[in-house]
Amino acid sequence: MKELFQKIWQNELQFLNFDAKFQDKSKLDTAECAIILSVNKDNYERYFLLKEFQELCKKIDLRVDIFSMQNAQICILNLFKSGFISKQDLLKALKILEKISKNTEIFDFILQEKVQSIDQKALFQNDFKELNTINLELQKLSFDENLKSRLQKTLEKFQNLEFNIAITGVMNAGKSSLLNALLKEDFLGVSNIPETANLTVLSYGKSEEAKIYFWDKKEWQNILESSHFNADLKEFIDKLDKSVNIEDFIKDKPLIQNIALCELKNFSSAKNKISALIKKIEIKSHLEFLKNNISIVDTPGLDDVVVQREIVTNEYLRESDFLIHLMNASQSLTQKDADFLVHCLLNSRLSKFLIVLTKADLLSKKDLEEVIVYTKESLKSRLVDLDENLVEKIDFLCVSAKMASDFYKGLASKESLQKSGMQEFENYLFNELYAGEKSKIALRAYKKELHLELKNILSEYEMQNRLIKENKQGVSEENQKLLLELQKQNTLLKEAQDEISNSIAKLKNIDSGIDNLVLLLAKKLKERLIDEFKYLKNNAQKLNLSRILNIVDITTKDGINDILREIKFENIKKIEELKTNLSLKYDFLKDDFDNGFEGFKDGISKNIDSIFQSEKFALLRLKIEKLSNLKSDLYELETNLDTVIFDTFKEFKMSEILNSLNINGAFFEFLNDKLKHYEKNQKSKLESLEKVLQSLKNQDANILNSFEENLEKIEKLKQLEMGLLNAD
């Protein structure tokens, strides 16, 4: 490693400890690690001036100077060599940075370095086990039942952390076969649980059962409205109306039916007409794979005629922790695949996802590699006007579900399983989930909550010993002083409550003129479409409907994302400023305010993202598609587009929905919960203090003799605190 640093830093190389390691291994993601590694003697001055780079350094308490930068690079490389950073992901990130930073030496070093393989699932579970052990020890040391109960609830909350995997693909991509191989049992697509056209959520349950959720009247009305612009959907619904009494299933409030798994074939089979009335299906099973707190979302095929099912799918994709897209290796990249993948690359919050080439046993290794290259190049060509590097978010694996299933059924040897690619797929999946951002956030949040409770317990025992010690020395004034301190904090607490109420009342909901911005976006979309139609007419070119819809997608979604990003920034900025001011004024509340604040902000961001109505947008696409196919002159087309686009954009009602989120009210509830938590602790401390003072006054032998016991507990708590701070 020293030779590498001599190459990239030359005469700027500092005196360094090449065994240096980060105290917290999870503070930086792979992209941030790559940015720090790309700093060298030729570019460090430019990097140091960038505001974004300064913010990155601040995140890990790193000074912006040469020594600190080189030391951080050593820490990152040691993390990488220990197996905590994915080699493949780090190389991808460095490759993207090549355009702004020449990083050949560091790239080659990582490429050639042999790294340890880490079982991320085992590591994650071990980290949780350590924190659970600390939690149980704190429960033993707790001084009241309320605190013990809070710690137990915290343990259960994090113990039940769930991961959601979404599986997508066109019909016949092999979803059921792959899932059966993953579950190691023929569970889906068999007689009892047929292949379904509905979105199906599969999760762990002690008993096996299913829940059927039907569309409500409002949702069904949207489907009917969509059918006016889609001939296939109209024909489908007309046939359905003649064969099924729709009113039996479509109610004002969604009808939910609990059924046994064996009854599922009567509802969900793609051949069964009733399946069209079903919004989603939830299946509970005690399959071994699902015991890992993993839920699998099996989505309808991308070529589904019911647009609303696609909207429900997109809502689940937004909440998923990982996305797996299946493609039949023999059929390669279809138009539907390409459209979906480009949409995900442009809009998904996920940092990466996986394409699995199914039925891999039907092609040679060389042919499979060619399919991967072709898929990457095809996607890059679709992204040429945007960002080709987005393709680097995709990983590829080749799997034969049949070979794996044959082994699990006892029809093939272990060699068949090893050649199937199924074990690599399963290991990849566990590593991505358990080393992902959700896992890191959960561990950090758990540590923070435990540390807060530990400090409360520690302060209680220290306070008791201070009272006992001062009593022995005959300093009763000090005891009264301590009592007054607690009473004063109670007064300040009331003051803080009043100030929070007044501050929240003065806060304005920030919508950044959202309705005007949406109308400007509508104007931009109409102009882009008219420019495209004029170009086609002037050059006597045939209409490419896919390109028209691509313009609609990219213009609308990019514009909406920009608007929402600004709204999120402004709203989060105002609540951060208020929280900071309150923490400075009432410093005894700082830890409580910090606890859970990142999760609160994340929730606000997700709520703001959800205000864009996907159903209205889907209807807009159908209307534009129909207008595009009509043989009308440019003037008539422009008039019709103007009406359709502006009317639909007004229907988005984004300002109204944003106000209904009541962000200020939610922030008030967050702060109020923290005040209640602190108030409970203070009340408990005050009661304990008064009890101790009374016992001391009565010369109670038990309290007088508890000094040494408390010292042991204090020592134990300090050891637990060290364990908590060192826990990874």
UniProtKB/Swiss-Prot annotation:
Disruption phenotype: Double dlp1-dlp2 deletions have no obvious cell division defects, have no flagella (possibly due to loss of expression of flgP) and are non-motile. The keyword GTP-binding applies. It comes from the Bacteria. The keyword GTP-binding applies. Changing residue 175 to A: No GTPase activity. Residues 1-119 are annotated as: Assembly domain, required for tetramerization. It holds the Pfam family Dynamin_N. SUPFAM superfamilies: P-loop containing nucleoside triphosphate hydrolases. GO terms for molecular function: GTP binding; hydrolase activity. Residues 470-695 are annotated as: Required for liposome binding but not for tetramerization. Keywords: Cytoplasm, GTP-binding, Hydrolase, Nucleotide-binding. Coiled coil: none annotated. It is found in: Cytoplasm, Cytosol. Residues 358-361 are annotated as: G4 motif. Residues 169-176 are annotated as: G1 motif. Residues 298-301 are annotated as: G3 motif. Residues 388 are annotated as: G5 motif. GO terms for cellular component: cytosol. Belongs to the TRAFAC class dynamin-like GTPase superfamily. Dynamin/Fzo/YdjA family. Forms a 2:2 heterotetramer with DLP1. DLP2 forms a central back-to-back dimer flanked on each side by a DLP1 subunit. In the crystal structures the 2 DLP1 subunits are in very different conformations. This is Dynamin-like protein 1. It comes from Campylobacter jejuni subsp. jejuni serotype O:23/36 (strain 81-176). The gene is dlp1.
